[in-house]
C-alpha cells in the first residue's frame, strides 16, 4: 500500500483535523530523515509508517479519553517506556493536544541519539512532552498510563518498572504472538 492509500485508511479510522494531519506528515518526513542517522524503526516498516506506527499509536487515544473522563477530568500522567522514534507517545501528544485533553506525557529512552531525536521532533512540531534520557527503572514517579512497544518480555518489564505502577495504573503494552504465554508467566507477580 502506498503512502496516499495508507493516509486514506488512517483518515477512515481516525477523524482528525487538517492541522493534526499536517503535523503527522511532518513527523513522518522527520522519521525518514532521522532513520539515516539512527535506527529509529525497523527498515521493513519504513514504507508503512501510517498504518504500522501512526494508526497503532492512535488506537490509544480512546483509552486516554476514557481514563481522563473516569478521573473526573484531571490531567493525566502518561509514560512511554522505550519510546524510540516516539511511538505511541508523540502521536498521542499530537492528537491529545488537538482534542484539548490535559495530559503530561513523558517519553523515556536510554539511547541518547533517540532522545535527541525526540527533542528535535518536539521543537519542530511544537508539541508538549518531556524527554528523559535514562532507563525507565531509574524514574521515581507513578503514572496513570504506561505504554511500551517492543521493549522486553512482560515479566521483565514488570520486574524492572514495578516502581512506576500504582494499583489504578493502566498498562498498555504492545505484545507479539506470544502474549498469552507472557501474561500467564507474569500472573505470578501481578494481578490482572
Feature-to-residue mapping (PLM):
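Conserved active-site region of classical short-chain dehydrogenase/reductase
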Residues: 58, 90, 155
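Conserved S-adenosyl-L-methionine
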Residues: 80-84
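The start of beta-strands in P-loop NTPase/AAA+ ATPase cores
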Residues: 75-76, 170
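Conserved SAM-binding loop of SAM-dependent methyltransferases across substrates and taxa
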Residues: 85-100
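Class I SAM-dependent transferase core
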Residues: 2-73, 79, 112-127
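Residue-level signal for inorganic ion chemistry
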Residues: 31, 92, 174-175
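S-adenosylmethionine
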Residues: 96-106, 110-192
